[in-house]
């Protein structure tokens, strides 16, 4: 249940969104209700082990072996995840032309599953795999089937789920792992089609996001601490243009000083309420 102070803030947000065309940017917090772990605590501090860096992944075969061994065990959770009420609420708002567009930092494709159109996937998608040699893309399901067939020794191994389809796997299981091959060129330098730490967002994706900010009259940030520059810069640009930036997020965000309003309540409760109010009025 949403308490009275939260409902007062939400009513103010409803009035603002009824008057202005808002762009929405989402982060890991919108998918936690779908069973996908997020990255940071309420103070914006990253949980768990440090992520693999792009240069390490590209330049070190052992790093790729480690990544894919862990990712093979993490994929079933990602592939089975279902969009939750927050994803569906944003899809409903978009269908009624009540939001200007949708940008996500998430790589789980749950916005698309919920029915959202033309989602800008700022950091890519785990549902695709890119070959670093021939640049062809493959469906993640096909790569998963290949890895399972070649690494039967991991079939019954349990590993704790981590963000972005990663797992906490005992290193003893990694050494014998056979990395997947590209179905197009048989190369062994496959990478999930996502932006790693230390890697730049594709220029065409960044340009689409920038244009979306320019065309919108306000920005609604959902479920993200905005610690990644790729998303924070959008808030900064919006605020510099004198447009309102509003957040629905538990805890600290990098953009707190830029926010007109912050609602600290579960997005899977807040967004359905907001959608119902905006659509029925």
From Swiss-Prot:
Organism superkingdom: Bacteria
Chemical reaction(s) catalysed: N(6)-acetyl-L-lysyl-[protein] + NAD(+) + H2O = 2''-O-acetyl-ADP-D-ribose + nicotinamide + L-lysyl-[protein]
Organism whose genome encodes this protein: Pseudomonas syringae pv. tomato (strain ATCC BAA-871 / DC3000)
Tagged with keyword Zinc-finger: no
Role played: NAD-dependent protein deacetylase which modulates the activities of several enzymes which are inactive in their acetylated form.
InterPro entries: DHS-like_NAD/FAD-binding_dom (IPR029035), NAD-dep_sirtuin_deacylases (IPR050134), Sirtuin (IPR003000), Sirtuin_cat_small_dom_sf (IPR026591), Sirtuin_class_II (IPR026587), Ssirtuin_cat_dom (IPR026590)
GO cellular component annotations of the record: cytoplasm
Entry keywords, A to Z: Cytoplasm, Metal-binding, NAD, Transferase, Zinc
Protein's name in the database: NAD-dependent protein deacetylase 3
Domain Deacetylase sirtuin-type: 1-281
Active site: 123 (proton acceptor)
UniProt keyword Oxidoreductase present: no
List of residues binding NAD(+): 27-47, 105-108, 223-225, 249-251, 267
The record's free-text note on cofactor binding: Binds 1 zinc ion per subunit.
Residue numbers binding Zn(2+): 131, 134, 182, 185
Assigned protein family: Belongs to the sirtuin family. Class II subfamily.
């Amino acid at each position: 249940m949403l308490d009275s102070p939260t409902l007062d803030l939400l009513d103010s947000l409803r009035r603002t969104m009824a008057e202005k065309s808002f762009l929405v940017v989402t982060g890991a917090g919108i998918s936690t209700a779908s069973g996908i772990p997020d990255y940071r605590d309420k103070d914006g501090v990253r949980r768990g082990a440090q992520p693999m860096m792009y240069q390490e992944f590209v330049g070190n075969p052992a790093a790729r072996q480690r990544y894919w061994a862990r990712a093979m065990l993490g994929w079933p959770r990602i592939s089975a995840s279902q969009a939750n009420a927050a994803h569906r609420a944003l899809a409903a708002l978009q269908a009624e032309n009540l939001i200007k567009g949708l940008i996500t930092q998430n790589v789980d494709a749950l916005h698309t599953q919920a029915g959202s159109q033309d989602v800008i996937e700022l950091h890519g998608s785990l549902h695709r795999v890119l070959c670093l040699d021939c640049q062809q893309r493959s469906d993640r399901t096909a790569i998963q089937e290949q890895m399972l067939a070649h690494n039967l020794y991991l079939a019954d191994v349990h590993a704790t789920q981590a963000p972005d389809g990663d797992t906490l796997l005992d290193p003893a299981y990694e050494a014998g792992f056979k990395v997947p091959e590209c179905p197009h060129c048989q190369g062994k330098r496959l990478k999930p089609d996502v932006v790693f730490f230390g890697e730049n967002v594709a220029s065409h994706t960044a340009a689409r996001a920038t244009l979306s900010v320019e065309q919108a009259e306000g920005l609604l940030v959902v479920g993200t601490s905005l610690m990644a520059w790729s998303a924070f810069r959008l808030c900064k640009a919006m605020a510099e243009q004198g447009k309102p930036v509003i957040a629905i997020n538990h805890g600290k965000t990098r953009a707190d000083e830029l926010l007109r309003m912050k609602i600290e309540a579960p997005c899977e409760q807040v967004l359905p309420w907001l959608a119902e109010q905006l659509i029925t009025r």
